[in-house]
Amino acid sequence: MIYREMLKSKIHRAVVRQADLHYVGSITIDATLMAAAGLWPGEKVDVLDITNGARLSTYVIEGEADSGTIGINGAAAHLISPGDLVIIVGYALMAEEDARSYQPNVVFVNGDNQLVRMGTDPAEAYDGVGLVRGDTNSPQPSLSEQAGDPRRAQ
């Protein structure tokens, strides 16, 4: 059987609120965002820094719900600083037949790291942030065109 490592969870364009070099390691994520993304404490994630291009792997620590906390801990604080925009990505190994139909949890946040929208399309660019879709230079489909997915109605 073939297994593929697929995108499972994505928190898009979160703002790093704190960085603590002297912590033992990890990323602290607001519990509400963790639940929306389907991330668990201790789960491995990649953190992609939009501000400076750094990429790293670490594990998740649950932060206070609805706090907007995104905190970089330990050695990663050398690479990612408060104020940086990041994408937090979780993956899952899936059998090929499951991977073909799996839809990830894509979480969009505002500048305060509060959940503003959820989706399943990893190429989606949320309206109002000045981005284009990841798979085309075409404009985003309207919200009414996207209404078929109940997770988009946030």
From Swiss-Prot:
The lineage of its organism: Bacteria, Bacillati, Actinomycetota, Actinomycetes, Frankiales. NCBIfam families: panD (TIGR00223). InterPro entries: Asp_de-COase-like_dom_sf, Asp_decarbox. Residues 129-154 are annotated as: Disordered. The gene is panD1. Pathway: Cofactor biosynthesis; (R)-pantothenate biosynthesis; beta-alanine from L-aspartate: step 1/1. This is Aspartate 1-decarboxylase 1. It catalyses: L-aspartate + H(+) = beta-alanine + CO2. Residues 135-145 have a biased composition (Polar residues). Disulfide bonds: none annotated. One of its GO terms (biological process) is alanine biosynthetic process. Gene3D superfamilies: 2.40.40.20. Its cofactor is pyruvate.
